[in-house]
Each structure stands twice: as C-alpha cells, then as structure tokens.
Amino acid sequence: MIKRERYMSRIRPFIGTELVKVMTGIRRCGKSVLLELIQQELTQSGVSPAQFISINFEDMRYSHLQTAQALHDEIIKRAAAMEGKVYLFFDEIQEVRDWEKCVNSFRVSLDCDIYVTGSNATLLSGELATYLGGRYVEFVIYPFSFGEFLELYRSVEPDEPVQKCFQKYLLAGGMPYLANLRYADAPSRQYLHDLFNSVQLKDIVKRNKIRDVDLLERIIAYVIANVGTTFSATSLAKFLKSEQRAVAPETILNYIRYCCEAYLFYQVRREDLQGKQILASNEKYYIADHGIREAVFGGNMRDINLILENIVYLELLRRGYEVTVGRTGDKEIDFVCGKRGEKLYVQVAYLLASEETVSREFGAYDNIRDNFPKYVVSLDEFDMSRNGIKHRNIRDFLLTEDWT
C-alpha cells in the first residue's frame, strides 16, 4: 500500500480533532485507502481498532443504512457498547439520504472523531455547510501523480528506465487499482472503461436524474476530445446542431457542471493578467485521469501536447495551487498558479523542435514583469533555459518537490 504522504501530511494535523474530515474525489481515486492509512496511524499511536466503526455504503451489508435515521440508530447503538472515543469512518457517504444531519448529530452527542469520503463536489454545499457551520476540513483526492505511479510501476518493472515508465503513464494514467492488475494493457483498459461507465451512470446520470443520456454522452465525448482547449457552450451547441441535436447552451453548461461535480472534469477559468480580472467565457477543461481518456476514447499519443498539459494541471492541483489560464494581450500562458501569496507560471509544450516553437513558448512571458518563477516544460531532454525562464523536462518537473 502506497503511503500517499502528500495527503497524509495535510490530514495528520486534524486527526483526533472535533473537525469532520471530508475527503472527496473521483470514484476509485484512493479515498478508501486513505481511511485505512488513517486507521493505521491511529493504531500505531495506541488507539485500539475496537474503537473504530467503518462503513462503506456501497457494500450491500449496509444497504439497510440508506437513511439518516437508520444510520443514526445503528451508530448510537454500537457506540454505546464501546469505551472511550469512537472513530467513525464513512466511505461514499453520499449514498445516505440526509447524511449531513447524522454527522452533525454524532459530532454534538458523541465523543468521536469523524472521517467521511464522497465522490461528488456538492458534498460540502448547501445543507452540510449549514449543519456543520465551518466545523469541517476538506481534502480533494486525485489519482496517482507520476511520482506515485513510478513507485508502484517499479514494483512491477523494477529495471524499467524512467523514460519508459513515463510512456506507460501517458497511456495508463494514475488510477490506483491498475497496480493490482500489474498494469497489463487489456485488463487495465477494461477496468478504466468500466470505471468511466460507473462514474457516468452512478455519479452523473443517476444523481442528477438525467433522462437524455445520449446527449450527455455526446457532451462528454466532445469535452474529452477537446481537453485543454478553450471552447464555449455556444460553440458546443453549434457542433451538436450539426449532428441534428438542437440543445440550449444552458443545458450544456448544466451537464458539464454535473460532470465537474462528479470530478470527471475540472474547469479552468481564463484570467486577464493585465486587467487582473477573470474572463467570463471560453474556459478550459481537463479530465481527472488521462488513462480514462485513452481507455474509452483513445488518442493520447496523437494529442500528446494536450495530455502533457492535463498531467501538469493535475499535478498543480495536487500541490495545492489555484490555477487559471493567463492572457496578456495576444499571448496566453497555460497555467498561472497561486498559493499563499506566492505565484508560479507554467507553459507546457510537446517538443521545442524549432526556433519558432521556442520563441512562442518562451515569448508567452514577454509581458510578465514580476519575479515569480516561470517555467517552460516539455519532453526535451536538454536544458534550454533562457532570460530567467527555467526549462525543464516534464518528468523532472513532475518529480521535483520544490518549484519555487
């Protein structure tokens, strides 16, 4: 089991506190394993496993606990038979209707430490925010980074050079369970295809009561094909009209929002760096795991420049950056990244194969006058840094702990 220390280091300060620890992220990205890691650390610190109550609400053994009242009664009964603090671990809690009422009740009436996971971003909206009133901390969990993938893939192919490992990562992506399949091509594709279908059906169609599944599938296919490129709901509506599917831009935006809430896609807004304002249209979208894109739709190597962008974007999120696409005049910077008052700029390219490409990628920073770090990241093996702008091979960039 990989330790996922980047997440554990953030969660650890809150272990044992009254704050509810909420872990969200796309289905099967490793949230359940984090619950196990937390239990391991608690046990190592002297807490008896007899004080743990763990429930995975997708397990049929707990199908009778699908309402707040049923869950409340079960936990109160079990906690009454236990001594000392109770540690509650609820996996995929969105399956329980009105679950937030339970969590708040436990927090108030029990001496407990609560951890919950869910596969939808709306887990923390509306009702929960009202009931908990700021008494929770959220951790968004992502599929494996290249560094995490490398650690596990090397257990399967210990002598594989890092270049070959990265080629595998470009196609396989970072879903943790692939390690159990030893990253074999056909089983991995089947698993990712089935996972995609599960996210689409359970977390998007079923949750949002979507009737026009064909329309949803067309929108998802379009967004995935256009990962990392700017487009508007209006342009997508025109495309669908060409396929004899007339649909309002508002409907398209709703369907894309449902996909983002299920963590299938991430939206990146565009920012005018000179006017210091967020632009209202033509956002970019990236997929939660590029391996899903390859398994379901193919084309990762054909669209490698976009896939490299996708990989870098997810790595920026993992490290806690808020990310926008930057515009300065007629130039665009792939990622403008902010965290605790610090800023970082990242430009992603496939290969700097010509002077024209070099000029375009490095020239994106011509209008940026501050002294924050600026990177151009590509697959090139040799360093082409210039004018204070750092050039890095993408593998080295992803494996570097400190970019500042």
Model-derived features with residue positions:
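Short glycine-rich substrate-engagement loop in P-loop NTPases that contacts/grips substrate
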Residues: 54-84
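Accessory nucleic acid-recognition modules appended to NTPase machines
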Residues: 183-343
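Catalytic cores of nucleic-acid endonucleases
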Residues: 326, 350-395
